[in-house]
A protein has these predicted regions:
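TRNA-recognition modules of translation machinery and tRNA-sensing kinases, especially anticodon-binding
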Residues: 2-142
Length: 142
């Protein structure tokens, strides 16, 4: 063992992903707080859903194009699951899953990371923050 050097792992970020160092992270947090305050001023409530969803829930009737964008995984129970590619599909699942707790009209917002397994490019990332706002069952958005 003496004389053998451990090889170091080269630190690197996956293609299509990015780190936010303190300056950028603080700016992003300030922008998010401002957006949240505006949404809440207009009567929208925050909702959070898991980053992972069942594959059939995410695909629904989304077709082949959506299918290509998924980061696929398998749960410990061997169920097909994937990282969410947007925040709207999980919201639709939430509305269908909790009809007694969530009554229309329901105004909600969500912010968080989403993942798409498409080709990254300038300004196009595989993980990015999405801001989503919906007025379910409301005649108007205000």
């Amino acid at each position: 063992m003496a004389g053998k050097k451990k090889s170091l792992v080269a630190p690197r970020t996956l293609k299509g992903f990015q780190d936010f160092l303190p300056g950028d992270a603080l700016l992003r947090a300030a922008v998010i707080r401002r957006i949240q305050a505006i949404f809440e001023l207009y009567g929208y409530s925050p909702v959070e859903t898991p980053a992972l969803e069942h594959m059939d829930v995410l695909l629904g009737a989304g077709g082949e194009e959506t299918n290509k964008e998924l980061f696929r995984l398998e749960s410990p129970e061997e169920d097909p699951i994937a990282l969410r590619f947007d925040l709207t599909v999980p919201f639709a699942r939430l509305m269908a899953q909790y009809p007694e707790q969530i009554k229309a009209p329901f105004r909600r917002y969500a912010m968080g990371p989403v993942w798409r397994a498409d080709k990254p490019g300038p300004g196009r990332f595989r993980q990015f923050t999405q801001v989503d706002i919906d007025a379910a069952g409301a005649a108007t958005v205000s």
